[in-house]
């Protein structure tokens, strides 16, 4: 368990592994913060399968952010010679608006990436992000993600996405 204090607003939040009892709050955050939403069972399945890398930010019992990953085998997004690797996939990450820009997303991502590497033996990680989501792209670049590919019309509303990847 990690306690983080934000010096700007004196907010103490805890980064911890998600539990089944967090799912309703995670779905609430997903629906309020992102246009891409998933059904209840999708979150439950990811928690059951990849729970050691599925983290939430907890502020006095209220979940204010989450990161939902999965682990898979596939072709490397980073190597020039095609090779199969075990890789992490950040399926969804979101933080409630009042808790953005104070390090919550950074802490969530840091913990999940470490678990992907240490617990699940992933060699690299990837994600998709809207090309206009500049704050998220900036966050990912802090973790050495790079834009690997442009995915045209990736989202339901027609917006393009970047496929971004980083070594672990």
UniProtKB/Swiss-Prot annotation:
Q: Does the keyword Zinc apply?
A: yes
User: CDD domains from the xrefs?
Assistant: NAT_SF
Per UniProt, residues of the N-acetyltransferase domain are 13-168
Example of a GO cellular component annotation carried by this entry: NatA complex
UniProt keyword terms in alphabetical order: Acyltransferase, Cytoplasm, Metal-binding, Transferase, Zinc
> At which positions is CoA bound?
93-95, 101-106, 133
**4Fe-4S is among the record's keywords:** no
Q: Which InterPro entries match?
A: AcTrfase_RimI/Ard1, Acyl_CoA_acyltransferase, Ard1-like, GNAT_dom
Provide the top EC class.
transferase
Chief location of this protein?
Answer: cytoplasm
Question: Residue numbers for the site described as Plays an important role in modulating multiple conformations of loop regions and contributes to protein thermostability?
Answer: 76, 83
- Kindly list the places in or outside the cell where this protein is found, as annotated in its UniProt entry: Cytoplasm
Q: Tell me the residue numbers annotated for binding substrate.
A: 38, 155
Domain of life of the native organism: Archaea
Q: Could you cite one Gene Ontology molecular function of this protein?
A: protein-N-terminal-alanine acetyltransferase activity
Chain residues that bind Zn(2+):
89, 128
**Marked site: Plays an important role in substrate specificity:** 36
Q: From the UniProt record, list the reaction(s) this protein catalyses.
A: N-terminal L-alanyl-[protein] + acetyl-CoA = N-terminal N(alpha)-acetyl-L-alanyl-[protein] + CoA + H(+); N-terminal L-seryl-[protein] + acetyl-CoA = N-terminal N(alpha)-acetyl-L-seryl-[protein] + CoA + H(+); N-terminal L-methionyl-L-leucyl-[protein] + acetyl-CoA = N-terminal N(alpha)-acetyl-L-methionyl-L-leucyl-[protein] + CoA + H(+); N-terminal L-methionyl-L-glutamyl-[protein] + acetyl-CoA = N-terminal N(alpha)-acetyl-L-methionyl-L-glutamyl-[protein] + CoA + H(+)
Q: Which EC number(s) are documented for this chain? A: 2.3.1.255, 2.3.1.258
**Complexes and interactors:** Homodimer.
UniProt lists the family membership as follows: Belongs to the acetyltransferase family. ARD1 subfamily.
State what this protein does.
Displays alpha (N-terminal) acetyltransferase activity. Catalyzes the covalent attachment of an acetyl moiety from acetyl-CoA to the free alpha-amino group at the N-terminus of a protein.
More info: NAT does not require a binding partner for activity.
Which protein is depicted?
N-alpha-acetyltransferase
């Amino acid at each position: 368990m990690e306690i983080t204090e934000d010096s700007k607003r004196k907010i103490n939040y805890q980064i911890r592994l998600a539990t089944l009892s967090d799912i309703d709050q995670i779905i609430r955050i997903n629906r309020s913060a992102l246009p891409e939403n998933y059904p209840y069972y999708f979150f439950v399945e990811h928690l059951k399968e990849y729970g050691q890398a599925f983290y939430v930010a907890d502020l006095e019992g209220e979940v204010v952010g989450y990161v939902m990953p999965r682990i898979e085998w596939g072709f490397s997004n980073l190597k020039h010679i095609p090779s199969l690797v075990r890789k992490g996939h950040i399926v969804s990450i979101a933080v409630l608006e009042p808790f953005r820009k104070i390090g919550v997303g950074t802490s969530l991502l840091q913990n999940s990436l470490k678990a992907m590497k240490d617990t699940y033996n992933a060699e690299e990680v990837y994600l998709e992000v809207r090309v206009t989501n500049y704050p998220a792209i900036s966050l990912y670049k802090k973790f050495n993600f790079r834009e690997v590919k442009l995915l045209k019309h990736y989202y339901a509303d027609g917006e393009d996405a970047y496929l971004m990847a980083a070594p672990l």
